[in-house]
Amino acid sequence: MVRHPQHQILGVMTDFTLSAATVAPAIIQWQRVHGRNQLPWQNSRDPYRVWLSEIMLQQTQVATVLPYYDKFLEAFPNVQSLAQASLDEVLAHWAGLGYYSRARNLHACARTVMEQWSGQFPDSSQALESLPGIGRSTAAAIAAFCFGERAAILDGNVRRVFCRFFEIEGDPGLGSTQKALWQVAQHALPDTDQIASEPDSMQRYTQGLMDLGATICTRSRPDCKSCPIKPGCRALATGRVASLPNPRARRSRPERATHLLLLVRQGRVLLARRPDKGIWASMWSLPASDSKEALLQTWSSLLMHAESPLQKMAAFTHDLTHFRMLLNPWRVELPQSFDLSWFETNLDADYAWVDQDTIAKYGVPAPILPLVEASLSR
């Protein structure tokens, strides 16, 4: 049994002996009986499948991920097929999951594995962390699930569990709090004796921590009575479960207006590729400007040929991490006789005319897709 001295963590004295001696065994035993054991990526040591699930689950709930995971595997059953696909194909299959930088990193990572690792994922968390889009916690999860490595994870659910169990103060997103959480995460791992006697202990422990945070130690209304580690939970003992982790200081979310041009011609809609940096990078969306005036100026020579005046559609909002988008769509129809060579002459960005048969091939952001599909169905 590995014993750890007492450490000072943000002013809170925490006995790591308790974590090493009781937390890991309790979580492992609980996970065997009460944890989530029927998810499609479980019971697999295939790094590709585990990696895909870990990336999809970042900031996204399991129920949302499940249908996307199966469809993504149908399209890209292995790292080779993903690496050989175009970014457009990957974004099209990712559309709707949000946080699209994950899809771009996924594609880049697959190509790196093929080019630099001979098509095989590296078998250590340190090497995995060097790949595009794989951070410390994700690398540890893959290494634990696939290779049984004794590596600590610290996703959002696990941070909440440790903040409460060890009564750690501070915003979990701050560097000082993160450092403390990584320290306890490392010391709470199963000891080497347990790993030697139970070959699946790292897989069970890692999954158990995730399950505990997702189903028991939830953000609101946690089920403390069912928690396998409640005897040692400092927040439960002091009545502070509801106040930990400390909430982040609320910041006002600025609103940014964007004006969209829904250009329709014979039941087809014009899409333009977004820049390769910024919001919805490299995806296909409606042409956009920061103001109506800028939109009109850019498209003035085209709009004079429209069959009807520019039609204002209902505005709507879409929340992103740091700001709220106020989206103002404007619809206009072009006659069949309009010379399409205008687009080659006047547009700098890539563009495409899509219809009901081709829209699925393009990665269109979730807030924009209903606008496009509604016009295609007319």
Predicted regions and their residues:
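Catalytic cores of DNA base-excision repair glycosylases
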Residues: 15-19, 25-223, 229-242, 304
